Amino acid sequence: MTGTAEFDSFADSYDRDLAEALAASGEDRRYFAEGRVKWLGGILQRMGMKPRRVMDYGCGTGSTSTLLLEKLEAEAVVGVDLSLRSLDVARKNNSSDRIQFSPIEKYTASGSVDLAYCNGVFHHIPPAKRSEALRFIHRSLRAGGLFSFWENNPWNPGARHVMAHCAFDRDAVTLSPPEAKRLVRSEGFTVLRTDFLFIFPRFLRLARPAEKLISKLPLGAQYQILCEKTD
């Protein structure tokens, strides 16, 4: 991730800034967060996997950490981030003793995590430092652990619009799905599947049930690469 100071400056306005950027979609951030976690949960259920310990990498203010705990029925969630101010906000907003928040530099990556989740973080990490971030995630996972890697799809005009109008995304460097797959494979992950979500904005919401049928097409505003730690 980028420097601590950058996201410290957005910690208190993060929700408002994101809401303004997402306004064109007709939905709020919770809609997208719940959609990602629900999609992931369905896949895990079909795989027969119930992760006990989950990492929320780049957790920010912690809103998704709560969803991961509740929707995936995890025993514990640890959210890690560079921004100390964002972590302070996360602690204030999350009272469960099953969720902990830690600065990345103070977290020991010990191979105890069953599932690592990361959304919209890597486009903030300078390309030269992305491998280092992936190695941290790899070390954090147990053998056979899964990595749910979500990113904004630069091929989707809606995603580009949101990023162009989001205060903390304007200097982001996006990753195409092929770039992201090459990156995770280079750091010892095996790609299990790639899915594209959030194709239809709210005014076309009646078409949303069809998204499951076309989730392999690179149309959605976000994509997930689900990977396994295999070496």
Segments and roles (model prediction):
Residues 31-50:
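Conserved alpha-helix/loop element of class I SAM-dependent methyltransferases that forms part
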Residues 153-170:
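Short, glycine-/aromatic-enriched active-site segment of Class I SAM-dependent methyltransferases
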